[in-house]
Design a protein with these regions (language model features):
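Alpha-helical oligomerization segments with coiled-coil/rod-like character
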Residues: 1-34
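Catalytic cores of peptidoglycan-degrading enzymes
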Residues: 34-180, 184
Length: 184
């Protein structure tokens, strides 16, 4: 299992390096500003917040780089803002994942999908374009939506960027992982 963890960490580092390269290449998009849309319409229960936690699979205490949203297999995972798909495919710990560049150094990542519904180069619309179907691929203990916000290639807590009338459920919003039924 340690070799698998090392491989997942290597793949994670590759994704981050690719994101930084794409950011440096200046993809021709412009961030339209404002808040990001809630990425899983109809599902607001956060099962794990951004921050330090004990990983439910590896048992390692480390940064959880996004938020996990409890949702059933096959639920729609939508673009949080207008942008261009810069990565769509399988990536180790993330499983099936999509990265969207919104311009201005802002990117969002959607992971653990059962089905990818966009391709690299596709233009997506805020709240309208389905980028993934919720699933449990990669390092996952159950169906859920893992959502990240990256500013200039660095992950940050997504919640301050999300407001469109959705107030996430307060269930299990501590930074320590206590419910491992649907987490990365």
């Amino acid at each position: 299992i340690l070799s698998q963890i090392d491989e997942y960490n290597r793949q994670f580092d590759e994704v981050n390096a690719e994101i930084l390269k794409l950011a440096m290449d200046g993809i021709d998009t412009q961030y339209i500003g404002g808040e990001l849309a809630w990425p899983v319409p109809g599902y607001t229960r956060i099962t794990s917040k951004y921050g330090m936690r004990t990983h439910p699979i590896t048992g390692v205490y480390k940064l959880h780089t996004g938020v996990d949203i409890g949702a059933p297999m096959g639920a729609n995972f939508v673009a949080a803002n207008d942008g261009i798909v810069v990565k769509a495919g399988y990536n180790g710990a993330y499983g099936n994942m999509v990265i969207i560049d919104h311009g201005g150094g802002i990117q969002t990542l959607y992971a653990h999908g059962s089905e990818i519904t966009v391709n690299v180069g596709d233009t997506v619309k805020r709240g309208e374009t389905v980028v993934l179907k919720v699933g449990s691929t990669g390092y996952s203990t159950g169906a859920h939506a893992h959502f990240e916000v990256r500013i200039n290639g660095v992950t940050t807590d997504p919640l301050p960027y999300i407001t469109n009338g959705v107030v996430p459920s307060s269930e299990n919003q501590n930074t320590e992982q206590t419910n491992t039924t649907a987490s990365e």
